[in-house]
Curated annotation (Swiss-Prot):
Family per similarity comment: Belongs to the ethylene-response factor family. Class 1 subfamily.
Taxonomy, superkingdom: Eukaryota
Recorded GO MF terms: DNA binding; DNA-binding transcription factor activity
Name of the protein: Ethylene-responsive transcription factor 2
Length: 233
């Protein structure tokens, strides 16, 4: 059972215990004539007798260590280069300009033609030219002569410049045939009889050539509706 601790301690015990307590805790505010202080003193005395050692409550100065400011870690973000603009170089197919009254021949030359309103829109051959511009200019000159200021032209700003006529492409002349050379020789050095025969042969040759030219012109002059346009393909 719990036995109350006697609060009455002899002066000798108090005087012998005080050095121990004062060495541990320093000066204790305990008074001998105070009953409550004596109760506390009795508890401490019993504890020391039982082998209890008070904690070392001596205040120790703690040196404040300098605080290291830790910067937040930055994760390097790889810079992504903007995608290079892919220029799709598309092959530009050059398209020839379309000119009024001009069409391209299969072998690359350009033919100029015009329709004559006085002949119900019959096509009139103007010639073959090296470039489409020359053929278009030939058409402009013919159209201006036919219709005047009402003509629809390819180069209206050039009609009053008095430019020379575009140069036509002519077929290569054939080499003289043996018959023609013989006719010429007979006309110069032959007898009168041979000369008469040579003259007759020359007339026949000229007649054949004229018929051939007439057939060629007839093939070129075909009927077309009035207002139709010929364009370079």
């Amino acid at each position: 059972m719990y036995q109350p601790i006697s609060t009455e301690l002899p002066p000798t015990s108090f005087s012998s215990l005080m050095p121990c307590l004062t060495d541990t805790w320093g000066d204790l505010p305990l008074k001998v004539d105070d009953s409550e202080d004596m109760v506390i003193y009795g508890l401490l005395s019993d504890a020391l007798t039982a082998g209890w050692t008070p904690f070392n409550l001596t205040s120790t100065e703690i040196k404040a260590e300098p605080r290291e400011e830790i910067e937040p870690a930055t994760i390097p973000v790889p810079s992504v280069a903007p995608p290079a603009e892919t220029t799709t170089a598309q092959a530009v197919v050059p398209k020839g300009r379309h000119y009024r009254g001009v069409r391209q021949r299969p072998w690359g030359k350009f033919a100029a033609e015009i329709r004559d309103p006085a002949k119900n829109g019959a096509r009139v051959w103007l010639g073959t030219y090296e470039t489409a511009e020359e053929a278009a200019l030939a058409y402009d000159k013919a159209a201006y002569r036919m219709r005047g200021s009402k003509a629809l032209l390819n180069f209206p700003h050039r009609i009053g410049l008095n430019e020379p006529e575009p140069v036509r492409l002519t077929a290569k002349r054939r080499s003289p045939e043996p018959a023609s050379s013989s006719i010429s020789s007979a006309l110069e050095n032959g007898s009168p009889k041979r000369r008469r025969k040579a003259v007759a042969a020359k007339k026949a040759e000229l007649e054949v050539q004229s018929r051939s030219n007439a057939m060629q012109v007839g093939c070129q002059m075909e009927q077309f509706p009035v207002g139709e346009q010929l364009l370079v393909s």
